[in-house]
Regions:
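S-adenosyl-L-methionine
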Residues: 1-43, 51-58, 80-106
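Conserved beta-strand/loop positions that form the S-adenosyl-L-methionine
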Residues: 45, 68
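Conserved glycine-rich SAM-binding loop
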Residues: 48
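Conserved SAM/SAH-binding beta-strand->alpha-helix loop
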Residues: 71
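Class I S-adenosyl-L-methionine
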Residues: 164, 169-226
Length: 226
């Protein structure tokens, strides 16, 4: 479903301009200058309206968080939420995952968040999934040694497929669950996650830690899980 066009988008974004990075490529290798002394640099791919972004920043104020979002109408809401909360450790980038190596230097990112991404359910769309091997290889270029991907989704088929895909590209899985909130709310939730939890929908989650890996000549292209 397409998001309704926000009124006064440009002036609203300008009003939150202090947290908007207009030229992320110029900061490649220098992101930590935005917050000297930051414990970690984390990147959220697809921040949406920013509930997870703002709540994570509030819970861990010593972490530099870069929120990447390619839908300006969603990002402006996230920017306003962060600005109104007075959070100084969050910055926003209008972009997508394919540009990560152009925006970040090798080893610059400690953690990536992928929350409720588009599942791209058709088999001929699999290369667009953010857990596809092509993207995983990009993440390897920018993650620090032992860096992590924290992945959550409500889509059971995407999760099952991802659990097979991710280890093939030099990531070790841990904290795997198909019902994160079985015994009650766990951790910081996104807007989607709150909605799904209230409806009793299970949430899938895993952590993928980068380990040494050599790319094979021709990685196997697997069919979708049934």
């Amino acid at each position: 479903m397409r998001m309704r066009k926000k009124k006064n988008l440009v002036p609203r974004m300008e009003a939150c301009g202090s947290c908007l990075i207009r030229d992320p490529f110029a900061l490649r290798g220098r992101w930590r200058t935005l917050m000297p002394g930051a414990r970690e640099l984390r990147v959220e791919l697809g921040c949406g309206k920013g509930r997870f972004t703002a709540d994570t920043a509030a819970a861990e104020p010593d972490v530099l968080l870069i929120a990447v979002e390619k839908v300006p109408d969603a990002m402006v809401v996230a920017m306003e939420r962060v600005t109104e909360a007075g959070l100084r450790s969050v910055f926003f980038v209008d972009g997508d995952a394919a540009l990560l190596p152009d925006m970040f230097a090798p080893g610059e990112i400690d953690r990536l968040y992928i929350n409720f991404c588009d599942p791209w359910p058709k088999s001929n769309q699999k290369k667009r999934r953010l857990t596809h091997g092509n993207f995983l290889k990009l993440y390897r270029q920018v993650l620090a040694e032992g860096g992590q991907i924290h992945f959550k989704t409500d889509n059971d088929k995407l999760f099952a497929w991802s659990l097979e895909e991710i280890p093939q590209f030099g990531f070790q899985l841990s904290e795997v669950t198909t019902d994160l909130h079985r015994d009650g709310p766990v951790g910081v939730m996104t807007d989607y996650e709150r909605k799904f939890f209230s409806e009793g929908k299970n949430i899938n989650r895993c952590v993928a830690s980068m380990v040494p890996w050599e790319e094979p000549a021709e990685p196997e292209d697997r069919p979708d899980a049934e």
